[in-house]
């Protein structure tokens, strides 16, 4: 993103360093876990393994090579919460989520909202100082991003992916871009972050999650 752009919102300081999900299909779990930390106002990672275990159980899905539904993940956060990451660390090499031990404490819960009104809801949440999770289709160029780390009108579709919306900026020409937080580690793009245009979201995003602490 150009230094001449007008940064309207930037919530990166509210999060830990970007984590790496590795080969497991848990992007939605990572993004929702980050949002659960944010909504509880803690700058500390929460356990993805714990959340994945409960979400797969709620979904009655034993195929751990597939991703999870939004409804299962947000229900798991609302009903079971999450402990700190150190209580049940993530292992990218696992084929099956770990089973949690009993009496983990503390647990962090969030209630949720899901909407298809993507851009208007993102704007409202950012105005309120809040991050969101967006689910969208990915273009081919997602794997070859270079400076200024922007996605706009892109070709192809390599699958769906969940990320966290953490910022917004306006370019000198008036074009609006949103900052996304990925789950592919700090080596990807700009320390794990990149920018997507409003047009990109309008053409590729199909669900949005907002969450609040209990």
Outline where the language-model segments fall.
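Non-catalytic, low-structured ubiquitin/UBL-interacting segments
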Residues: 1-14
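Predominantly the structural core of cysteine protease catalytic domains
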Residues: 5, 23, 29, 33-37, ...
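Acidic/histidine-rich, surface-exposed loop or edge segments in extracytoplasmic proteins
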Residues: 12-13, 54-58
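Immediate flanking context of iron-sulfur cluster ligation sites
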Residues: 13-22
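Phosphate-handling active-site elements
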Residues: 15, 37-52, 174
């Amino acid at each position: 993103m150009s230094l001449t752009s007008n940064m309207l919102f930037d919530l990166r300081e509210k999060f830990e360093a970007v984590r790496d999900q590795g080969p497991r299909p848990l992007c939605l779990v990572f993004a929702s876990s980050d949002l659960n930390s944010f909504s509880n106002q803690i700058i500390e990672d929460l356990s993805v393994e714990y959340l994945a275990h409960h979400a797969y159980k709620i979904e009655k899905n034993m195929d751990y090579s597939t991703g999870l539904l939004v409804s299962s993940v947000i229900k798991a956060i609302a009903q079971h919460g999450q402990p700190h990451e150190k209580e049940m660390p993530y292992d990218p090499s696992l084929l099956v989520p770990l089973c949690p031990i009993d009496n983990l404490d503390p647990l962090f819960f969030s209630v949720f909202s899901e909407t298809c009104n993507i851009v208007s809801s993102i704007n409202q949440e950012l105005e309120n100082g809040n991050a969101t999770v967006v689910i969208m289709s990915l273009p081919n160029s997602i794997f070859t991003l270079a400076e200024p780390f922007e996605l706009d009108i892109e070709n192809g579709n390599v699958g769906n992916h969940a990320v966290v919306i953490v910022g917004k900026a306006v370019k000198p020409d008036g074009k609006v871009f949103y900052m996304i937080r990925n789950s592919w580690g700090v080596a990807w793009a700009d320390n794990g972050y990149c920018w997507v245009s409003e047009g990109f979201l309008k053409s590729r995003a199909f669900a949005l999650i907002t969450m609040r602490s209990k």
